[in-house]
Each structure stands twice: as C-alpha cells, then as structure tokens.
Amino acid sequence: MGKSINKVRGTALILGILAIAFAFFTRIVSIFEYVTFDIGPDPDQISGAYLWMDMWKGNFPQLGPPGGGGKYGFTIPPLYFYLGFPLTIFGADPEFQVLTNGLFSFLSIPLLIYFVYQLLENVEQDKRLLLSSLAGFWYSTIYADYFINNFSWAPSPIPFFMLVFALLYRFQMETSQPLLYQAIAWIFFGITVAILVSLHTTTMLIIPVTSVIASLWFVYRNRKNTLKCLLPFLSILSANLALFMYWHSEIVRNFANTKGLVRALTEKGASAEPSSNLFTRLFKAIWETVYLGNQVFFLNDNISIFNVVVSAIFFGISLYIVIKKYRGNKTLIGFLAITWIIFLYASSNYPDEHFYSHRKILLWFAPILLAIASLAYLNLTKTFDRILGLVLIIIIGYSIATNLYFDQRYLASKYGSERLLSVADTVEIINQIPVGSTLCDPAKKGKRKEHGQYDYIDTFMTKRELMITNACPSGSYYIQPKFKMAIQMNDLFPIFTLAKTSPLDRPMTSLLETPEAYLYKIE
C-alpha cells in the first residue's frame, strides 16, 4: 500500500514539474522568438507598442482597446496597458511588451494546480494531488492559451485573473480571519474586477454581474453582521479607484463611451437580433459550449465532426458525474457556475458570425474542472464508474495529444528549419541597410499606413532613419520573409499553417540571405 501511495505521489510530482517546465518554456522562453508582432487584419500589437512608448513620454491612456471588435463605437477600460507597462522598462523591444502576458499565463499553471486542489475537498490526499497536477499539465499544453499569450493582446491574462477572482471570493465566504484581512481581500476583489473588465468585452459585460450576485449572496449569508455586510462596498470603491483614468475620461466626455456601449446593446442592427425562441437560444448556448471542444481541446486543421462528437460525449459524461457525485468545495464551483451560466445566456444572444475561441475564454477552465472533478468522485469499485473513468482518461489523453501536436507546430515556426521571421531577425537584417535608405513595405497601407512594424522597429530599436514606403522605388531595399503565417480567421483561430511567400514582381538584386528571409535591393 505504501509503495502504491508513493507511486501516486511520484506521478503527481512528475506531472506538476512537467506542467511548470513546459509552461515556462512555451510562455516565457519562446516569447523571445517573437513572430506575431504583426498578424491578422488589425495591427493591434504595433498600435499597442506605440502606446507603451508614448506612456514613457507621460501620455497615459484613459481608454482601452475598441470593444466588440471595433464595430460598435465603444472601448473597454485601459488597465491592460497599465499591466503591460512596467516590463517595458527593460527596453523598447516588443518582446518585453508581451512578457507580461507570458508571466500571467505561466503563473496560471501552478495557480490552477492549487485551485483544483482546493476544489477537490473530500478526496484522499494522494488522489487529490495527482488530479490537481494532471489539471495543471493538461492546461499547460493548451495550444490556444500558448498562442494568445505569445503576443500582446488584452484577453490573454483573463484565465489567471479568473482564478484569482474565484479564490478571493472563496476566502471571503469561508474565512475566520480578522476583519482587517477580510477588508484587504475585498479591496483586492474589487481591483481584480477592474482588471477583468479591462481585458475584453465579454468580461466587461459579465464580470460585473457575477460580482454583484456574489456580493449579494455574501451579504445574505452575513445578514446578522452589519459590519461584514458593508465589506463589499470596499470592492466597489477599489474597483472604481483602479478605473480612475477611465472614469475621468467618461466625465470629461459626458459619458460618451457608456452611451456607445448602451447603443451597442440596445439598438437594432448593431448585431444580429437574438431569437426569442427559448429552444433556439438554449440550443445555441449548448452548441457553443460543445463546439469549444473543437476550438480549444480537440484540435484539427479543419472543422471535425469526429471532434464535435468527442466533445459532446466528454461534456455529457463530465456534467452527468459532477451533478450526481460532486462533493467538493461548493463556494468555488458555485461561483464559477454562476459565471458560466451568465456567459451561456449571453452567448445565446450572440450574432451568427464567427465565435472565436478567445471570446469563450471564460469557459476555458470548465472542461478541465468538470473532467477532473468527475475523476475525483467516481467510485472505481463499480464497473460502470470504471468505464466512465476510462472514457474520460482516453479523451483527456486525446486532448493533450492534439494540443501538443499544434504546440509543436508553433514551436517549429519559431525554431525549425522552415521558420517565421521574428522581431530579432528583422532587427539584424535592418542593421545591414545603410542609414537613411528607403525600405519597401507593401503592407504599409490601410490600418498600417501610419504605423507599420518596420516603422516601430526602426524608430525605437535600429534607429537607421529609414524612409519606409509602400511605393517601392528603384534603389529601395526589400525584406522578403521566406514564410508567412496563414492563420485561420474563423472559428478555428488561432490554428495556422506556414505558407511560402512570393517575391515582388520587380527586378531585384539579392544582397543577403538568412534562414528566415532575403534582403533585396530593387533595381
């Protein structure tokens, strides 16, 4: 028996170490091969880079990125920019701007292990340790989390702060610590709310509702203690103080952003009109949950009916077991369940367009927590429970395997023989171009006309005083990456493939070849 226990603990330790080591390499180390500084239709990373440099000049943002994909005339609060700002003290390199995301993603792995351990009450110690480590390792392999935390993007830190959000609420509901500690926890609860509403439109709309419901439940549970009932007001105060710059802007602008948000939520035509049919809305909420498996947990280059079926079986079994057998911490699971239900209600109103995986980021932990809780409370002395457990383990293994495959592809695009051009590679090439030369950039148009990637790199890093233009006159220089990222801008985002680039249809002289690119001079 003792040897069996030692094996379980040893396996738990190995899984925990693997989770943290893999997360450290993918979320921290590989950031410095930064290949996503300029991807997609919008140059968000470049715009953010300029904004952080402006902050060093004393220009502090009062509003954040556009909400709702920039289609509805409102923005989210600006705290993401303030989260990313401190690490830019190390330099203007874009890698330091994304390092904050990498750190939060890395820290979310041990935090998830701790969270799951707290969740699995009434489970024997060794099993609890093993399943907590399994949850951490599983999440460390999630390709979608790896990808979005390897470039500068506001939604990326949501998983970390959701864990903090839930753990703080559990502390408030269950602690016997002195009132001072409870007051401090409520202050941090409010700051966490302020951060979460500053990361994405979904959190901006859903987290305040969750926090109000949670606070009202806290007040109800402590209704005989007047002083404790006043504690949630500390979170309201701290949240609004954290959002001081945003509220200052709103007051000065006569609440223009709030009015834009209200218009987006109420005006017909701002989005597809939601169905009033209860069955239709319920089906959409269920479908978007099941389809999350195809987007985050069971990956394929194309939409896969097989993966959708696997996801449906997986969710069905997990939900059935948790509803029937769960005996863990009710505060944590209840808090998350409220958030998930509010999100699912909101998703049933979502217009019929691409529902990208990052827009479902509040659900990302749900499959992991449901599956791990299911394994924790199955009675493995019963044949039926053993069969269910085996099915779940096989599906979890399949999820880890498919994600590791896409992790490997992403790593190969950074370190393989056929790889993308990184910021560091670009700097090395630009340093070979004579000072004051003209650099041809065909992408410098539309949203990139003002600020393209070469503009930023030369202004703040290489300082070669280049003239960057999309006109490409004779005598100008042209950098041709050997490969580009062909990313799927649909429900399968951020899956991508490498595509060979085509040379300019101009006579050119080759000056330099690196493993990632060519440098030409246009004749």
List each language-model region with its residue ranges.
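Transmembrane-helix motifs of polytopic, lipid-linked glycan transferases
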Residues: 21, 99-123, 163, 167, ...
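Transmembrane-lumen/periplasm boundary regions of multi-pass, lipid-linked membrane glycan transferases
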Residues: 49-54, 207-223, 228-315
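Hydrophobic/aromatic-rich transmembrane helices and adjacent perimembrane loops
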Residues: 205, 331-383
